[in-house]
């Protein structure tokens, strides 16, 4: 698990306060499903995922993306205990949903891309480094049940 400096924590929480969770969540999950189409198999119940425009406009994708980012927002308040914060979600994704833990890394990388798009010049290399550390640590926490 990554160790977060006080600067990392400040950088993460400062940017997070400006994130529109609904928009960024839908875009992040939508992009994951478009860019990595094999991840769609976990979302059979979401209806039409036949094209990029269908995925990006799908209300179930948007709603679940918001749920995912809301959970990530909670994590920004518990950076020193991500494993504990995500224990139940790790169990759900491992035992019940059988999600490949590699997908958590992919989702984190897509989120970093979405943040870069949304925040432009404000998303400096230093901000990116803190967020990359965050999404890597979250992916590790979500994967903890698999080991």
Swiss-Prot record:
PROSITE patterns according to UniProt: GLOBIN
PTM characteristics: Acetylation of Gly-2 converts Hb F to the minor Hb F1.
Residue list for modification Phosphothreonine: 13
Modified residues (Phosphoserine): 45, 51, 53, 140
Signals that turn on the gene: By 5-azacytidine.
Domain Globin: residue ranges: 3-147
List of residues that carry S-nitrosocysteine: 94
Record note on what altering residue 3 to Q does: In Macedonia-I
Binding annotation for heme b: 64, 93
Tissue-by-tissue expression: Red blood cells.
GO molecular function: heme binding; hemoglobin alpha binding; metal ion binding; oxygen binding; oxygen carrier activity
GO terms for cellular component: cytosol; haptoglobin-hemoglobin complex; hemoglobin complex
Modified residues (N-acetylglycine): 2
Disulfide bond positions: none
UniProt similarity note: Belongs to the globin family.
Protein name: Hemoglobin subunit gamma-1
Source organism of this protein record: Homo sapiens (Human)
